[in-house]
Amino acid sequence: TLLNTLGCLDTPTSGEYFLDGISVRTMSKSARAILRNRKIGFVFQNYNLLPKTTAVENVELPLMYNPDISSAERKKRAIKALQDVGLGNRLEHKSNQMSGGQMQRVAIARAVVNNPAVILADEATGNLDSRTSFEILVLFQQLHAEGRTIIFVTHNPDLIQYSSRNIRLRDGKVIEDSINKNIMSAAEALAAMPKPEDDE
């Protein structure tokens, strides 16, 4: 429910929700859809990639809702986003040709291609092994360092040490809201992990 509200899929039943200075509660469904497509990037646990399309085509999708962006510009931005997440060599690969970590990188590229005000990540490392999870956390920390707002939902308490602010919910209520003054580096944690055997 919280992510549906934050993602402009639902409106709050009470109170106000402002996204990038705009009140969401009073908006029409179509206005929320436009806001969602231009201001919010989504990253899901199960990637939500279209199976028979290439990485570039998947990343282009959010830009298709903006008539001011030409197809050439769409492709250019999608390629840049994929290069930024380390997939410049997988542009034409389809989902069945990529690992879970690569698919999640495509999902992150798709989330940032619109330069959104906020990125919502729902259990974004939930389906990944430890090493790949930390590779994804490194990307999120880099995006945050660039000034992006990221709301990362997780049930894994070990991940809170890598974020700047932690809010714990129980039964829809905030039970803890704390600032992390000692944010751990996901890159350092990744570097300390044993290398996979096929890399040695």
Locate each region found by the language model.
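ABC family nucleotide-binding domain
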Residues: 1-162, 166
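A cytosolic small-molecule/anion-sensing beta-strand core signal
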Residues: 170
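Conserved beta-strand-loop-alpha-helix hinge in the C-terminal portion
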Residues: 173-199
